[in-house]
Swiss-Prot record:
PROSITE patterns: AAA. Belongs to the AAA ATPase family. Pfam families: AAA, AAA_lid_3, Prot_ATP_ID_OB_C. Disulfide bonds: none annotated. One of its GO terms (molecular function) is ATP hydrolysis activity. Keywords: ATP-binding, Cytoplasm, Nucleotide-binding, Nucleus, Proteasome. PANTHER family: 26S PROTEASOME REGULATORY SUBUNIT. It comes from Encephalitozoon cuniculi (strain GB-M1) (Microsporidian parasite). Acts as a regulatory subunit of the 26S proteasome which degrades poly-ubiquitinated proteins in the cytoplasm and in the nucleus. It is essential for the regulated turnover of proteins and for the removal of misfolded proteins. The proteasome is a multicatalytic proteinase complex that is characterized by its ability to cleave peptides with Arg, Phe, Tyr, Leu, and Glu adjacent to the leaving group at neutral or slightly basic pH. InterPro entries: 26S_Proteasome_ATPase, AAA+_ATPase, AAA_lid_3, ATPase_AAA_core, ATPase_AAA_CS, NA-bd_OB-fold, P-loop_NTPase, Prot_ATP_ID_OB_2nd. This is 26S proteasome regulatory subunit 6A. The 26S proteasome consists of a 20S proteasome core and two 19S regulatory subunits. The 20S proteasome core is composed of 28 subunits that are arranged in four stacked rings, resulting in a barrel-shaped structure. The two end rings are each formed by seven alpha subunits, and the two central rings are each formed by seven beta subunits. The catalytic chamber with the active sites is on the inside of the barrel.
């Protein structure tokens, strides 16, 4: 009944109006009691469900304290069901996979399974070898070397930038020209010419994950271990891309294959074959780049050097006079050096020195000044350092039995 009708009734018949109001109040009170009863029922249901949830959470907590079975996801069938393979080598179909949504599971994922029901409790980290995980440099442990710390290698820096840095930071430039960037780079040259330093400077130039391998580390005692390390390293690189894989002293596993029947030689060849397989297993646009370094390029297997694997070869020769001057200035810039030191003369006096020996000259010059209790390093101290390094270079060790 509307407000106008009530007002009209109030004026015509006051008694009927009051009765209608009382009836309306009784109806509202009845509806209020019904709604209050429903509210109480809902509160009771919520309390019961909360108690059930708390009980189930406690059961899950207790179950999580039990040992898990480690298994793999074989197939995700739909949004609820899937097939898992437990470590007991038993495959199980799960109508409901468990606590992890199927949208987060992929075939091959490592998962923790309940030992009785095989339902999935947790998604585990990928199963990489601990040695491979330790080769990844953390963000706070990345190399701090820069190209300014390298002297006499301007052409090599440009070539490495084109092949590695540019393809990771500006891949659209290659797409515009419809060309594929190189997969990897081989740096070769005499020892001490800056190959490892160049790789470290390249890693600091990009925000890519830096995975450092060493050839001797990949030579393992047991059959298949070296190949597994290579396989795990590339799998980890693809997961954490963009990634730079630096393989130092690649000649330890990349030497030319022979007909040797020795077990050790066959294991090294098996490791190299796995490396070749991994180099062929990804495209140059997958944001995984390889930098390899060696001072024995003459013994490397031709299969490793062919195009499509290590596409670009960069030679690191001994520095010339200008390069040696630049290297000496770089290593002496933070030292207390007198203003009259002639680096041109020092560079001419270090004919045949590599970059590491030029650094050693600066160290020996500092030691010579330290012995004389000087506060600054002079030209004569540098000449003494050159003589010291030169004597080590020409010395011969005689062994007597």
């Amino acid at each position: 009944m509307s407000l106008e009708e009530l007002e009209a009734m109030d004026q015509s018949n006051p008694g009927e109006f009051l009765e209608r109001v009382r009836e309306k109040i009784r109806m509202l009170n009845s509806e209020t009691r019904i709604l209050q009863s429903r509210v109480n029922t809902i509160k009771h249901d919520i309390s019961t469900k909360n108690a059930s949830i708390a009980e189930n959470m406690e059961r899950i907590r207790l179950n999580k304290q039990l040992p898990y079975l480690v298994g793999n996801v074989v197939e995700v069938l739909d949004e609820h069901s899937g097939v898992v393979n437990a470590s007991t080598r038993m495959s199980s179909y799960l109508p409901i996979t468990g606590l992890i949504p199927n949208s987060e599971l992929r075939p091959g994922d490592l998962v923790a399974l309940h030992k009785d029901t095989n339902i999935v409790f947790e998604k585990l980290p990928p199963d990489y070898d601990m040695k491979v995980g330790g080769m990844v440099l953390k963000s706070d442990a990345k190399p701090d070397e820069t190209y300014e710390d390298i002297g006499g290698l301007e052409r090599q820096i440009e070539e490495l930038n084109e092949a590695i840095v540019l393809s990771l930071t500006h891949p659209e430039r290659f797409e515009k020209l419809n060309i594929k960037p190189p997969k990897g780079v081989l740096m070769y040259g005499p020892p001490g010419t800056g190959k490892t330093l160049m790789a470290r400077a390249c890693a600091s130039k990009t925000n890519a994950t830096f995975l450092k391998l060493a050839g001797p580390q990949l030579v393992q005692m047991y059959i298949g271990d070296g190949a597994r390390l290579v396989r795990d390293a590339f799998a980890l690189a693809k997961e954490r891309k963009p990634t730079i894989i630096f393989i130092d002293e690649i000649d330890a596993i990349g030497a030319k294959r022979s007909d040797s029947d020795q077990t050790g030689d066959r294991e090294v060849q098996r490791t190299m074959l796995e490396l070749l397989n991994q180099l062929d297993g990804f495209s140059s646009s997958e944001e995984v780049k390889i930098i390899a370094a060696t001072n024995r390029v003459d013994i490397l297997d031709p299969a490793l050097l062919r195009s499509g694997r290590l596409d670009r070869k960069i030679e690191f020769p001994l520095p010339n006079t200008l390069g040696r001057k630049r290297i000496l200035q770089i290593h002496a810039r933070k030292m207390s050096v007198r203003d009259d030191v002639n680096f041109d003369e020092l560079a001419r006096s270090t004919e045949g020195f590599n970059g590491a020996q030029c650094k050693a000259v600066c160290v020996e010059a500092g030691m010579a000044a330290l012995r004389k209790e000087k506060t600054e390093i002079s030209q004569n101290d540098f000449m003494d350092g050159i003589q010291e390094v030169l004597s080590r270079k020409k010395s011969k060790l005689l062994y007597f039995t």
